[in-house]
Amino acid sequence: MDKAKLKEELTKRISSPVLENEPLAQHTTWKIGGPADFLIEPQSIEELSLVIRFLTENAVNFRVIGNGSNILVLDRGFRGVIIKTKKINKVEITAGGQVFAEAGVLLPALAARALKVGLSGLEELCAIPGSVGGAIRQNAGAHGKEIKDVLKRVWTINERGELKEFFANECGFKYRSSRFKEEKQWIVKAEFSLNPGDKKEILKKIREFREKRLASQPLEFPNAGSVFKNPEGIPAWKLIKEAGAQGLKKGGAMVSEKHANFIINTGGASAADVIYLINKIQELVWKKFSVKLLLEVEVLGE
C-alpha cells in the first residue's frame, strides 16, 4: 500500500491527526531516534482496535509504544506506523476500591490517583516514567516490587482487533518480561489489586521512593532508565563500574557517573553513539567477568 493511501485509510479510523515523517526523538525519553513513516495517537480502545485490525489485514509494519521510556529508536527511524497509546488514558476507581487504568496512563499519575482515595500498593512503582501498558508488557519494577505484584487482570487486543482478558497468573510474568513481549497481543487496560491505607503513610512512602530515585539516577539528562538487565545475584551497574566502563563517552552519549547502568544523552546523542557504548560495555564486562549483559531497553527501527 502506498503512503498516500495508507494515510487516507488511517485518517478514516482515528479522530486525531496522522503525523507523517514524525521524528521519534520527540516521543522517547532518550530524545533519540529518526522519523516514523507515520505516527498516530488513537483516542480510545475502539480506535486502537480498528487500526490494529486494518494494519494486520494489510500487512503494514507497525509498533505500539507507550511513553517511549524503555526504547532506543535507531537513527534512520521506523518504516511503518507507530501507534502511541498516550490518549488511551482513562482511570476508574470504583466505590468498592477496584482500580482500572487504560494502557496510556502513566504510573506516577496512577499512583497519585490511588493516593487521593487512600489506596496503597503502587508506592514503589510511583517514579517509573512508563505507561501502564509498557510497564505490564515488560513487568517493570523498582525497590523490590514488580507490577505483577499489584496486578489483577489485563485486557488486550489481538491482530483481529478482538478484546481478550487475562488474569495476572496467566500473563507469563518473568524478570522484565511477560507473554505480551512474544505474542501478538497489545495491552489496552488493566485492573489493579490495591489495599486501603493511611494517606499520610502512602504519601510518605511515595516521597521516600522519589527522593531515592532523584539521589541515585541521572534524571537531569534524557535517559531510558536501566539499559541492561541485572544478571542473577549481582546488579548490572556494579559489573559496569568494576569493568571500568563508567564515564565512557561517544558523541553526545555517556555512561552516567551517577548510575553506571544508565546511558545519558548529554546533548545531540545519536542512536549510533548509544549502540557503540552498549557494545563497549558488554565487551568490557565480558572480558573482566565472563558475564554477558542482556539489554533491558528495546531497540526499534533501522
Curated annotation (Swiss-Prot):
Q: Where in the cell is it found?
A: Cytoplasm
Domain named FAD-binding PCMH-type: which ranges?
Answer: 31-213
UniProt catalytic activity: UDP-N-acetyl-alpha-D-muramate + NADP(+) = UDP-N-acetyl-3-O-(1-carboxyvinyl)-alpha-D-glucosamine + NADPH + H(+)
Entries under InterPro entries matching the protein: FAD-bd_PCMH, FAD-bd_PCMH-like_sf, FAD-bd_PCMH_sub1, FAD-bd_PCMH_sub2, MurB, MurB_C, MurB_C_sf, Oxid_FAD_bind_N
Which PROSITE patterns does the protein's record reference?
FAD_PCMH
Q: Which cofactors does the annotated protein need, by name?
A: FAD
The molecular function GO annotations come to: FAD binding; UDP-N-acetylmuramate dehydrogenase activity
Enzyme Commission number, as recorded: 1.3.1.98
**Does the keyword RNA-binding feature in the UniProt annotation?**
no
Which pathway, per its entry?
A: Cell wall biogenesis; peptidoglycan biosynthesis
A biological process term (GO) from this entry: cell division
* Key words, A-Z: Cell cycle, Cell division, Cell shape, Cell wall biogenesis/degradation, Cytoplasm, FAD, Flavoprotein, NADP, Oxidoreductase, Peptidoglycan synthesis
What's one Pfam family the UniProt record gives for this protein? FAD_binding_4
Active site feature: 176, 226 (proton donor), 296
UniProt keyword annotation of Cell division present: yes
Q: Which domain of life is it from?
A: Bacteria
The Gene Ontology CC terms held by the record are: cytosol
So what does this one do?
Cell wall formation.
Which PANTHER family does the UniProt record give?
A: UDP-N-ACETYLENOLPYRUVOYLGLUCOSAMINE REDUCTASE
What family does the entry list?
Belongs to the MurB family.
Protein's recorded name: UDP-N-acetylenolpyruvoylglucosamine reductase
Organism per entry: Carboxydothermus hydrogenoformans (strain ATCC BAA-161 / DSM 6008 / Z-2901)
